[in-house]
């Protein structure tokens, strides 16, 4: 009997301990904005970890050189848009500020043309022979040696021709920026322009570890600190590359990272940053929770810019086992936001189930365009001369047959937008337009597609087949897309087969591996603000004509290469954008990459505890506006 009593008492003690633990955990999150995720980061290194959960925390702890204006969903030009606090949205004047920069660690005026009498802004200059030669060396452009280090035979004229493609000799850009007052590191160390210079040079020094960051600095030449200001030199006039440099690279504290010799292995679990939040001791609990706390020493003026009312004191990110657990936690109100983005099928299921009425869905336009890309390389079925010489006609017929509206309905449950054959979405100011100034959408005409194929040697037989069997290489996530494409192409007598790829299939289709796929489901992020992406996706290496890293199609088109080069070397941004439209049109007419749709970015949240969420074009519900206007209900 006594043993039974002791057992019961022990069980009760365990239960009380568990309840106390849960209660303590709930109390800890009581004043927090609670965010659920299926993956907590084990690494907060802002340069080596690209997991979405890591990126989320990096945005809390670190700042970029400049900010960027964001357009709230629902804003229409000429119509007043009012934020939750009654303030009015004023868009950036893109005629003066084409990349929509705002202040960050530095003042945005430094990224605009220098006005007479001002120290700040940019100006053009021609580099010295020494500067030009130094940049060529950085780009591995050397006489008699190709980019891979192999010796080649070339004349001075041939060397100069390929060198000038990589490094122009005229119209470099020099910027001067003023540091924004108030920023400091969360360990109390003052922030200076030296930290920015250090960060940029550190990335270049460790380019092998920070490849994606180093890619943003392709045109970077040097920076220096002059009287407390940052003077930054771009080894080209490719102004649009400043978008990635200023908005994508977070700045590290020199006094911390200059002692780190192997940065790729640095987990950085107690980050020292200029952001408004930090991780207090004991608030990083591996495989459980990470809580970010508002800095008590954060500058009052910067805090007022960040928050319209009382600031969010704590942000707790809580690990949960799977997507469905997260969604139910939102429904019950035990978390406020789901960090993970979801597929349209999941959003459709939630939207059509009344049990989840408390779960709100944010589905907004994204920069990503899903495409069907043909292999026109030397080992691809669509190479020159392929299909009895009818490769282009077949590609064009497939383009005409594809119905984007139907794909968006069937694959995305309506949660996406159409895209023009230029691969750039219509809401970008510099997307391709026709002679009337109207955006050119993708054209669907099945009859015209069949008529075009009837001019080839591939005639339709009694069974409705033309004997054209093609394979689409795609990841499991895109299997439903392939099946939808197959259903549409059946109308023109083309049979499509699905070939499953791994999530890292990009490594398998690079041209140096002699890719022999027919087609792949690809994703591109073409926007007019990312002109440098065109060269990466359609360019070739100057010395041997080998295709560049992301040129999965294998295309080698001298006209396109010249057009891209002319665009990148244009004298000013307005001319670059004008030439960009011509490049877009030329790419559309090649029929080597066909747009399917632009899938919405979809996130779930709830307003049961926190209200003031603001949706932003091209972003999730977690953005600077939501941070600014969120307030605890009843507080």
Where are the predicted features?
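Ligand-site clamp/hinge motif
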Residues: 179, 265, 300-349, 495
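Detector for C-terminal structural segments
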Residues: 49-57, 289, 397-434, 477-486, ...
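Gly/Pro-rich hinge or "lid" segments in bacterial periplasmic/extracellular proteins
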Residues: 246-314, 324, 447, 451, ...
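Alpha-helical secondary-structure segments
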Residues: 34, 192-201, 229-231, 276, ...
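Surface-exposed binding/hinge segments that line
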Residues: 176-178, 197, 212-261, 265, ...
């Amino acid at each position: 009997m006594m043993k039974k009593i002791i057992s019961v008492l022990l069980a009760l003690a365990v239960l009380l301990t568990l309840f106390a633990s849960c209660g303590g955990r709930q109390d800890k999150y009581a004043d927090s904005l609670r965010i659920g995720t299926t993956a907590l980061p084990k690494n907060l290194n802002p340069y080596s970890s690209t997991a979405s959960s890591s990126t989320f925390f990096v945005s809390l702890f670190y700042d970029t050189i400049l900010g960027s204006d964001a357009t709230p969903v629902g804003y229409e030009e000429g119509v007043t848009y009012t934020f939750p606090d009654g303030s009015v949205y004023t868009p950036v004047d893109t005629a003066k500020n084409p990349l929509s920069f705002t202040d960050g660690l530095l003042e945005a005026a430094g990224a605009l043309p220098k006005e007479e009498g001002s120290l700040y802004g940019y100006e053009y200059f021609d580099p010295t022979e020494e500067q030009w030669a130094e940049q060529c060396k950085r780009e591995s452009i050397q006489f008699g040696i190709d980019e891979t280090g192999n010796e080649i035979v070339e004349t001075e004229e041939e060397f100069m021709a390929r060198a000038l493609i990589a490094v122009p000799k005229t119209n470099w850009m020099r910027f001067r920026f003023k540091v924004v007052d108030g920023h400091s590191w969360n360990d109390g160390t003052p922030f200076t322009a030296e930290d920015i210079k250090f960060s940029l040079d550190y990335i270049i020094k460790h380019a092998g570890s920070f490849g994606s960051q180093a890619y943003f600095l392709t045109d970077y030449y040097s920076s220096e600190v002059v009287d407390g200001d940052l003077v930054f030199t771009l080894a080209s006039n490719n102004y649009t590359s400043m978008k990635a440099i200023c908005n994508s690279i977070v700045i590290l504290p020199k006094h911390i990272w200059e002692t780190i010799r192997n940065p790729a292995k640095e987990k950085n679990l107690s980050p020292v940053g200029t952001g408004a939040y930090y991780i207090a001791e004991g608030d990083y609990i591996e495989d459980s929770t990470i809580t970010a706390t508002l800095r008590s020493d954060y500058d009052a003026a910067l805090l007022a810019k960040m928050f319209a009312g009382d600031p969010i004191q704590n942000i707790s990110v809580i690990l949960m086992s799977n997507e469905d657990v997260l969604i139910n936690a939102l429904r019950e109100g035990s978390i406020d936001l789901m960090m993970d983005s979801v597929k349209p099928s999941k959003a459709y299921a939630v939207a059509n189930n009344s049990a989840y009425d408390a779960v709100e869905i944010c589905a907004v336009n994204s920069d990503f365009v899903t495409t069907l890309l043909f292999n026109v390389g030397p080992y691809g079925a669509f190479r020159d001369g392929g299909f009895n010489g009818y490769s282009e006609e077949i590609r064009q017929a497939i383009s005409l047959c594809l119905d984007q509206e139907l794909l968006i309905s069937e694959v995305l449950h309506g949660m996406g937008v159409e895209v023009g054959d230029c691969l750039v979405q219509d809401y970008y100011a510099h997307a391709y337009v026709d002679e009337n100034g109207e955006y050119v959408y993708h054209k669907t005409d099945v009859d015209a597609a069949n008529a075009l194929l009837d001019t080839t040697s591939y005639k339709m037989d009694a069974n409705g087949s033309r004997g054209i069997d093609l394979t689409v290489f795609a990841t499991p996530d895109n299997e439903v897309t392939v099946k939808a494409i197959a259903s549409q192409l059946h109308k023109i007598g083309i049979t499509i087969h699905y070939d499953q790829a791994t999530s890292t299939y990009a490594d398998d289709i690079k041209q140096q591996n002699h890719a022999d796929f027919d087609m792949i489901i690809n994703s591109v992020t073409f926007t007019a603000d990312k002109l440098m992406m065109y060269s990466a996706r359609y360019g070739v290496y100057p010395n041997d004509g080998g295709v560049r890293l992301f040129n999965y199609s294998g295309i080698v088109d001298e006209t396109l290469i010249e057009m891209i080069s002319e665009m990148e070397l244009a004298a000013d941004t307005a001319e670059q954008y004008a030439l960009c439209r011509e490049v877009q049109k030329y790419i559309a007419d090649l029929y080597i990459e066909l747009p399917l749709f632009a899938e919405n970015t979809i996130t779930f949240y709830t307003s049961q505890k926190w209200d003031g969420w603001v949706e932003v074009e091209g972003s999730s519900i977690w953005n600077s506006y939501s941070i600014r206007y969120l307030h605890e209900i009843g507080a």
